[in-house]
């Protein structure tokens, strides 16, 4: 049985307009995917026992009340701090039921995951898209399933994510790939970037949004560097990161200029969007700016 943690609120107003979101929603706390680079592990977020997934108490009741009180609807984003399709979601169904509430109250949604389980809820995505903007994103950082298993050990491998996204895109949902982080010295090759963009095109994804580097904050930095030493003992990646990145918050690939050039050329070739403004305009097209909530 999943552990629970108390919660007073779940849907919060966002600032900055990340992917055009008006609200943010995290039903679960923590994540068990084991991704070695996860920024949510950082000390600044204050999540204790990060690798243990816990559900927020009375999550659906809180979400129902908060949606009902909103004067205007908008896009509710989820997946920023904890993957909404962790293994517990298969039986708990909290994300699915939350999406049903989002649909019932006339809101749009932006869902991010690394789990192929996301395809299960395609029917609800389609219902939401009938009245509001609906966006589905999946994080993919490498085309190599073997490398994926090393750096993202407890979640669907890249090929499974591509398959899931293809099914969702086939149903008419606006989909895309979050190409981030791209780990310097490990994933920052032209072959990897080209492979992801071309696969995005093949599966019907509309955009790829990249970040050619990785964030290294307190707590997460130490975890990441330790894992590099464990997984790739012969590569000396830890030493290379320490020498190249120093104590910087963001470690950008030394190949960033070349990668951006290759990336934009490939996106242009296949009509893949990559600019945030263009992506938001495209997936919200035809819905209007805001909608009144009559519930």
Positions of predicted regions on the chain:
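Auxiliary Fe-S-binding modules of radical SAM enzymes
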Residues: 1-6, 12-13, 191-295
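Conserved Radical SAM active-site core
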Residues: 1-137, 141-149, 158-162
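Short histidine/acidic/glycine/proline-rich micro-motifs that form metal-
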Residues: 83-85, 182-185, 250
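Conserved strand-turn element in the central/C-terminal portion of the radical SAM core barrel
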Residues: 143-145, 152-154, 167-189, 210-215
């Amino acid at each position: 049985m999943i552990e629970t943690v108390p919660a007073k609120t779940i849907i919060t107003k966002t600032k900055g307009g990340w992917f055009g979101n008006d609200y943010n929603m995290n039903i679960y706390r923590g994540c068990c995917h084991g991704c070695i680079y996860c920024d949510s592990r950082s000390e600044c977020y204050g999540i204790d026992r990060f690798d243990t997934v816990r559900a927020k108490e009375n999550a659906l009741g809180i979400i129902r009340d908060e949606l009902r009180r909103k004067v205007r609807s908008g896009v509710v984003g989820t997946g920023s701090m904890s993957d909404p399709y962790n293994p517990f979601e298969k039986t708990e169904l909290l994300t699915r039921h939350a999406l049903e509430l989002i649909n019932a109250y006339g809101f749009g949604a932006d869902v991010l995951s690394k789990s192929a389980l996301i395809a299960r809820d395609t029917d609800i995505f389609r219902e939401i898209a009938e009245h509001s903007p609906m966006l589905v994103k999946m994080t993919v950082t490498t085309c190599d399933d073997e490398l994926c298993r090393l750096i993202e050990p407890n979640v669907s491998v890249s090929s499974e994510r591509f398959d899931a996204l293809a099914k969702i895109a086939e149903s008419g949902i606006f989909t895309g790939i979050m190409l981030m982080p791209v780990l310097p010295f490990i994933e920052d090759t032209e072959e990897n970037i080209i492979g992801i963009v071309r696969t995005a095109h093949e599966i019907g994804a509309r955009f790829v949004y990249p970040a050619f580097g990785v964030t290294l904050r307190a707590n997460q930095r130490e975890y990441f560097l330790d894992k590099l030493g464990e997984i790739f003992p012969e590569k000396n990646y830890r030493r290379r990161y320490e020498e190249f990145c120093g104590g910087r918050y963001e470690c950008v690939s030394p190949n960033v200029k070349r990668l951006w050039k290759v990336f934009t050329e490939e996106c242009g070739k296949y009509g893949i969007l990559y600019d945030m403004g263009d992506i938001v305009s495209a997936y919200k097209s035809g819905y209007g700016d805001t909608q009144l909530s009559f519930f």
